[in-house]
Amino acid sequence: MILKKIIVHLIKKIVNGGFMQGQIVKIISDLHYVSCDGNLYPCKCRGIFRKEHITPLVGDYVLFDMDKLIIEKVLPRSNEFDRPKVSNIDQAFIITSLRNPDFSLNLLDKLLLTMELHNVRAIICITKEDLVDKDELKKIYDILDYYKRIGYTVISNRDIESIKKLLSNKTSVFTGQTGAGKSTLLNKLNPDLNLETGEISIALGRGKHTTRVVELFEFFDGKLMDTPGFSAIDFYNYTREDIRDAFVEFSNFPCPFIDCLHTKEEECAVKRAVLDNNILESRYKNYLSFIEEAK
């Protein structure tokens, strides 16, 4: 077994020009902690990185010199975020509370837009269903059925086994309003954590008073990015066309106008779809407010 590991190790070095490939799981000051074959290597970056404006992020796959503990190259990213500074996220669980805090379609659409713009799969995870009455719950799930129809996964935090399956072999983040139930969900996934609200980082191995840094952990056959939380997107970084294209259902209604923003034209196919109840009215109104911010 040991000989096999040595051979695999040597093959990897040969394939990568003498360097090893790993993933940055934590950055503290100028030390970048690279995970490789079950070990953690505190590495520094090549001096030329600064000159070339290369900033390694948590989540980056890199080539590094195992002996000198130097990161030689940052490999291409599938995506990257500025706040927090992370990369290569596969999916985001948008923890969506139905009460305390109240259900917000505006926030939900804003987070969905954020993930679409970054090429991240979004999973809507519903919490606190027991705090709303049956009639209100039915109305909310009628709305959520629309999100299912346009391609989003909607799941209850009670469906633990399905969530575990979704976590497998993926790099995930949990995001949502403060108090939406992220700690409660982690407790359900792993009762041994016994988390109090706001103690996610402590359960993952941090002291209560440590400075918050982004960190990537192994979690249920996948990886979980523990972050201070995703900020709302800065709309000025994107064009109105970017935002339009990130509303995935609009493409189902081809508009006769080239580069139509679906705001004014009377014959616009998207506007017609809203009137015909084929596009959720609240989602269209949120779209209008988002592109207004992007001007």
Regions found by a protein language model. Give the residues of each.
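Helix-rich effector regions associated with P-loop NTPase G domains
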Residues: D30, H53-V62, M66-K68, L75-A92, ...
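Conserved active-site beta-strand-loop modules that form the wall/rim of enzyme catalytic pockets
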Residues: T171-G179, S183-L186, V214-L216, D221-M225
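Canonical P-loop GTPase G-domain recognition
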Residues: L131-A180
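A conserved segment at the C-terminal end of the G1
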Residues: S183-L195
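N-terminal accessory targeting/assembly segments
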Residues: L3-F103
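General small-molecule cofactor/ligand-binding pocket signal
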Residues: E72, T153-I155, M225
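Short coil/loop residues immediately preceding or within conserved phosphate-binding loops
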Residues: F19, N169, D192
